[in-house]
């Protein structure tokens, strides 16, 4: 049975994502970050030649926060009702990450450069996994 609380629903584990820790000298780093308000997309250009565009919804769904990821295996929470979420602000955190402030009030979780890069490389797989979990839960992005 799924319980509804503040537009979120508990689910089984999300795909494993890159660890937040330990940038190495060879870790890709962004050379440009642009927020496209109208399209609700964040564009990141990395020094390894990759450029990724993320919908704000995708970044909200895959927030690295404990609120979304949980504090251990099996505690992940499926994010529902995020289709129209936007990003209100981006706060740098040292030289390794940013904190995103979403229009729905979510503002926890640090997005490291490694985490962004992993999300970009595997974006299609992660998105399809999210849609499958939504379907299985009978939940809506609206």
Segments predicted by a language model, with ranges:
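Motif-centric detector for short Cys/His coordination patterns
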Residues: 2-142
């Amino acid at each position: 049975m799924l319980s509804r609380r503040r537009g979120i629903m508990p689910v089984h584990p999300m795909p494993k994502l890159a660890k937040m820790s330990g940038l190495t000298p060879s870790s890709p780093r962004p050379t440009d970050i642009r927020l496209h308000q109208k399209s609700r997309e964040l564009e990141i250009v990395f020094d390894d030649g990759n450029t990724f565009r993320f919908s704000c919804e995708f970044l909200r769904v895959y927030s690295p926060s404990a609120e979304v990821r949980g504090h251990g295996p099996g505690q992940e929470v499926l994010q529902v009702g995020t289709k129209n979420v936007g990003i209100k602000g981006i706060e740098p955190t040292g030289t390794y990450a940013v904190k995103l402030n979403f229009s729905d009030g979510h503002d926890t979780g640090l997005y490291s450069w490694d985490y962004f890069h992993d999300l970009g490389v595997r974006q299609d797989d992660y998105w399809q996994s999210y849609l499958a979990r939504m379907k299985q839960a009978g939940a809506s992005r609206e």
